[in-house]
């Protein structure tokens, strides 16, 4: 049955229904209005975007956005930089502190301090719209982090360790801020508060290198951009972003079309889902950059060879065991090259450069290499299925926050399973 053509009134009614499907709760909506008022007072002239709830908070296009159109333009006065922090009440404490503090710590302390000030903070409209917690591995319990793929699990543990060390090494500085605080410094600058602030900066900042400051150490490249940080990532979207020295604004120009009432997206970079989960706390559906990483240790479980340890040492020394992966198109060039090198007798290892140039290792060794990679993928598939069963079991008795984390890992593992099955099929063709 064909669709009846709608008149103008019918089209408007359908558009209103489309818009209303994504309404956010009244509390978030009021906080969004407060943020717009705050930014307006700092020179922001408005945008064609409003806060909506899709599968989470995002910005909806009030009108169609064309390719080449300015998506958002945020004045420098609306950005939170280290210069913003140095001009605040914290500035005098930071400037006199030795050894010098890192830019990332300074931004984190600023967020914690401004949240502590509540409505007295000039930035309260922004702080109140930030999430209360995040779904990065820094928030995962040991039981949850153990469900991550090995490569991501290691990086997640390193993320937690970095945070603990940052908090521990900053205690003296935190105590020096006591004259500014209403409550004891150890309560205000707790590990949980620093974790929240660190994840806020890590997941929501834009890349915008700052001029070197004599009061800070290390690179200063992260800037918080209120409103702009509500734009979500989609891998297939293209934008042009950067600070415009003429307008003195950070600008994002869309390179693709966004229909009216649809969510407006930007692109955080060509990241696979493991990187997105680690750095931003989410996974993207249909991510063309996603792969499954292969840990070199798996070769010890599969290959029976008296010279394997020597071969692995050689590959490690020449950086051939880094970034081994499987995509939906099959094993990566690096994975196949590593396995082909493992197929060679030790006496032939002087030929390794020829293998890198694509020289064949011989029909028998090529068949051995393909069988070995198939075994690797099958071993990874078995592990993926096992972990998915464990996740489903954990979901039955998880807390709300833990459930959110488990669902993300479940999505990651399901994608992993699809990639491995597809990669195995490619080898069988």
Residue spans of the language-model regions?
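Long, positively charged leader/targeting segments at protein N-termini
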Residues: 2-78, 83-86, 114-429
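Hydrophobic or amphipathic alpha-helical targeting/insertion segments
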Residues: 79-80, 96-100, 104-117
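Secreted, disulfide-rich extracellular signaling modules
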Residues: 89-95, 426
């Amino acid at each position: 049955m064909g669709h009846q053509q709608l008149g103008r009134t019918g089209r408007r009614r359908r558009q209103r229904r489309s818009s209303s499907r994504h309404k956010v709760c009244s509390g978030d909506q009021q906080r969004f209005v407060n943020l717009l008022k705050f930014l307006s007072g700092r020179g922001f002239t408005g945008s064609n975007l409003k806060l909506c709830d899709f599968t989470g908070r995002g910005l909806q296009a009030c009108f169609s956005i064309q390719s080449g159109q300015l998506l958002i333009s945020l004045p420098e006065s609306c950005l939170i930089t280290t210069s913003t922090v140095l001009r605040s009440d914290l500035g005098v404490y930071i400037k006199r502190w030795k050894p010098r503090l890192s830019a990332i710590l300074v931004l984190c302390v600023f967020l914690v301090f401004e949240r502590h000030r509540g409505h007295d903070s000039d930035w309260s409209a922004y702080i109140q719209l930030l999430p209360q917690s995040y779904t990065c591995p820094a928030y995962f319990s040991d039981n949850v982090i153990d469900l991550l793929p090995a490569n991501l699990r290691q990086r997640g543990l390193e993320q937690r360790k970095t945070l603990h060390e940052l908090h521990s090494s900053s205690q003296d500085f935190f105590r020096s801020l006591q004259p500014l605080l209403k409550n004891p410094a150890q309560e205000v600058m707790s590990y949980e508060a620093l974790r929240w602030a660190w994840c806020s900066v890590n997941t929501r900042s834009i890349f915008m290198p700052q001029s070197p400051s004599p009061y800070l150490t290390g690179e200063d490249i992260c800037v918080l951009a209120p409103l702009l940080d509500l734009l979500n990532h989609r891998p297939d979207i293209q934008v042009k972003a950067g600070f415009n020295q003429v307008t003195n604004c950070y600008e994002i120009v869309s390179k693709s079309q966004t229909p009216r009432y649809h969510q407006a997206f930007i692109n955080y970079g060509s990241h696979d889902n493991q990187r997105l989960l680690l750095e931003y706390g989410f996974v993207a559906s249909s991510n063309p950059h996603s792969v499954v990483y292969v840990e070199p240790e798996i070769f010890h479980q599969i290959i029976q060879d008296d010279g394997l340890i020597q071969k692995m040492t050689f590959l490690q020394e020449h950086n051939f065991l880094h970034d081994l992966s499987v995509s939906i198109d099959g094993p990566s060039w690096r994975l196949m090259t590593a396995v082909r090198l493992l197929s060679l007798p030790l006496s032939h290892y002087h030929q390794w450069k020829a293998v890198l140039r694509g020289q064949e290792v011989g029909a028998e060794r090529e068949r051995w290499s393909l069988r070995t990679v198939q075994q690797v993928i099958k071993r990874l598939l078995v592990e993926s299925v096992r972990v998915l069963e464990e996740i489903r079991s954990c979901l039955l008795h998880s807390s709300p926050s833990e459930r959110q984390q488990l669902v993300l890992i479940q999505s990651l593992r399901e994608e992993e399973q699809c990639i491995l099955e597809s990669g195995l099929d490619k080898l069988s063709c």
